[in-house]
Amino acid sequence: MATVDLAAVDAHIDRNLDRYLAEVSDFCRIPSVGGDAKAMAAAEAWLVAWFGGLGCTAESLPAAEANPYLLAEIGAGARSVLFFNHYDVADYTNPAREVAGERHPFSGTIENGKLYGRGSADDKGTLLARMHAIEAILAATGGIPVQVRFLVEGKRGVSNRSLETFVAEHHARLDADCCLWEAGAKDERERQTISLGHKGILYVDLIARGTERTWPSRYTLFPNPAWTLIWAVNSLKGPDERVCVPGYYDAVRPVSEADESDVYAHLADDTEQLRVRAGLAGFVGGVTGRQALRQLYSQPSLTICGISAGASGPGQKLVLPQEARAKIEFRLVPDQDPAQVLAALRTHLDTGGFEAVEIEVQGSCPPYRIDAKGWLPRMLLETAARVYPNGAVLTPVATGIGNRYVFKEWTTMPIAGFAIGYAGYQIETNEEHIRVEDYREQVKWVATIIAALADR
């Protein structure tokens, strides 16, 4: 017998959708960029008030070197779920600033069936869809039949060590039957994606140093650290796009037969649309179609994110750089270990004659992955079929970086991810938006998940 009357819940969601969207707009107007203490405090207070109004026990818990974590709890039952989200807005890829001729980044406006604002998809809209699903179940049925916990962080990043400390201190309160992360959007075929994990990362600065100060370039007897750096960076990757760091691919988990049948066989081959949107003639290595999908999801990479040395800007500046620096990203896949990659990088540089090139680690986190045949992916696919006309598909990992691995040390709960979004949602730009109907569907899906978990 079903524990939750989903027809009544759906009707409540439909009646209250305009109010839900108004609340998302209101929350998106708070410019909660991680470095803005005043705005972050406002976003935190907004959430605490909302959770309190729903009847949750809500706490703001301090964290070292981070904005406070919010932990809210409601419901009772044999089963439990942890929702993981964040209330800060991504600012490190594309700064959230007002730009002439562009939409205000925190407008919160609704136009032509779309709600605009930085954070509307990543991650305020996704968070509120989960909150509104709980509100709808409570309003329609009078109770929440499972233990629901929200953990909302205020400092997202490549390597969030504060989360490691927080989970170590509070893991007993965070453990649940499952955790639902915030990663995944609709694909080109309008199917909701469910990510089974996250890629990992090792992000380093490579530094070559020369003289103790900048000298005029006429001193041609002096070594140029820019050349040293260029030669060192060039040694990391071959013309065939293979990373030359020894053992880099040794731990990469091969694509299994189960992944081929349960995951890759169902993925939309949207690589051609992606190539066209990016304005590219082709992808790295010339891959296309299904081969491109396998490379995207199952193969690690190396990216030069930036190089700096000496003079910049217009005009002639006849200088010899004092220092040269390259920002290097190793994006890792299961089962690579960032510590092992770092050690191999040091060995590679030393054996290549670049002992003087320094390595500064800026951040790292290992990848994470759950089995596609586990109970959680199966349940998410089944519940999505009730709400989404085109259903849902599994992705091996989210192509972004996440900290799911933090919970692995302290809990046994499986973690899968999904979020609001679609192929054209322009995430992390001033045009970031969600579609109104996507929001309605996601609220109903989360409610369906809660019902299925209660009946499990």
Language model region names:
Residues 2-120, 137-146, 328:
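Acidic/His- and Gly-rich active-site-bordering loop/insert found
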Residues 63-69, 159, 186-188, 398-403:
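Short acidic loop-to-helix transition motifs that present clustered carboxylates
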Residues 74, 208, 330-332:
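Hydrophobic beta-strand positions in extracellular immunoglobulin-like domains
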Residues 79-82, 114, 149, 177-179, ...:
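Structural motif
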Residues 88, 236-240, 346-355:
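A common structural junction motif
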Residues 115, 120-285, 291-300, 409, ...:
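Fold-level recognition of mixed alpha/beta catalytic cores in primary-metabolism enzymes, strongest
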Residues 188-189, 244-323, 331-344, 352, ...:
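An extended, acidic, His-containing surface patch that forms the Zn2+-binding/catalytic region
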Residues 202, 324-326:
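Hydrophobic core residues within well-ordered beta-strands of beta-rich domains
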